[in-house]
Amino acid sequence: MTENSTSAPAAKPKRAKASKKSTDHPKYSDMIVAAIQAEKNRAGSSRQSIQKYIKSHYKVGENADSQIKLSIKRLVTTGVLKQTKGVGASGSFRLAKGDEPKRSVAFKKTKKEVKKVATPKKAAKPKKAASKAPSKKPKATPVKKAKKKPAATPKKAKKPKVVKVKPVKASKPKKAKTVKPKAKSSAKRASKKK
């Protein structure tokens, strides 16, 4: 009985520690933006100066340096930060626009709006289906071309007319028939002479 009572309170502090870790500091992206705003350098602030500012103003863990590198890269790719010098996470960075504090609030609003926008995307799918329907009309145009092709077939019909000219050559056998009677007549003449 006593063992169960001692084990139960031990589990509660672990949950409390987990909640404290989430409340110790804001997001790294927000801290980086705050650090750059605090320095106010036109040339931009370096990653080392950003790390110093974050470590001095916020309670950050041991892996803060790697987290800062990753978040700086993300902010550069999203367009929140502009890299003035260097490549990757090294170099100096400055805010893309001066309205960054409003932007950080806008990011939270956009997250909520993204859920709302998800439903219009479903409504956009029927629009895609409607766009498929007009695509059937261009398919009807090749049918018109097919109608033109039968018009080309009468031209082919003219060629058989040329074939009809060939029976005229068949009249030559008729001449051959006329030759045969001559042979008979010569045979008759020969018989008369006898």
UniProtKB/Swiss-Prot annotation:
It comes from Mus musculus (Mouse). The gene is H1-0. One of its GO terms (cellular component) is nucleosome. Its main location: nucleus. Coiled coil: none annotated. The modification N-acetylthreonine is found at residue 2. Residues 24-97 form the H15 domain. GO terms for biological process: heterochromatin formation; nucleosome assembly. Residues 1-28, 86-194 are annotated as: Disordered. This is Histone H1.0. Belongs to the histone H1/H5 family.
